Every structure is written in structure tokens, then in C-alpha cells.
Amino acid sequence: MLLGVAGLVPGDWKSIDGAVLDNVAQHGFKTVQIRVDDPQSIKDKDIVRLKSMFDSRGFPMPQTVGNYGGDLIAEDENVRKNEIKFVKRMINVSSRLGSPNTYLRPGSLNPKGGWT
């Protein structure tokens, strides 16, 4: 089992730098997830930078994390179609990073919200 962490990253992938990864290692974790709010914002140079930082510390590439809200089951067809585009973009980013998986939530039709 690989023990990674999410809570030591102050934001999305843009905030991951050497200091963040060193802090993760000092706490005894072996990697840190990569949160991606906008998969279109990650360019090839960003992929190279992230992979280099992880590789230089012996961190395996972790899972990526996309939308927590998730609209795959939204009642509005256009909302669902946009979410499907997002999922496809996340799959592409995860593949480019060499990530073993991406974590996404399908959503909820619960009127009180998906967390209740």
C-alpha cells in the first residue's frame, strides 16, 4: 500500500512546488495527490515540471482529483455534456502525467446536496 496525502497541498496543482513535496516527505508520506480544477490549464511544460519534481524525490505519480461536485447525473443534458467533456480532459491529463487513476464524483440528485 502507498500512503499519500491530500491535505498538505494548499490548493490545486499550481501550488505544488519543491517545498510542498519536501514537507510531505518530512511528514512520512510517499506522495501527494494532484488536484486539477481546470484540466485545460495544464500545459506540456507543467506536466514536465510536475513529473520532474515527483521523480527527483522518488515520489510515484499519484492519482489526480477532479471535480468534487460532479454533474454526470445532472437533470440538465447540457450540464451532463459539459461534465463528460471535463471527465475526458481529466483522463487525458492523468494519462499525460502517468497517473494510475483519476478521482471524480458522479454527482447527486439529492436536493440537500451530494454530501448529505
Say what each PLM segment does.
Residues 94-115:
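Active-site groove signature of glycoside hydrolases
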Residues 75-78, 112-116:
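Surface-exposed cleft-lining segments at the edges of enzyme active sites
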Residues 1-100:
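N-terminal pre-domain/capping segments
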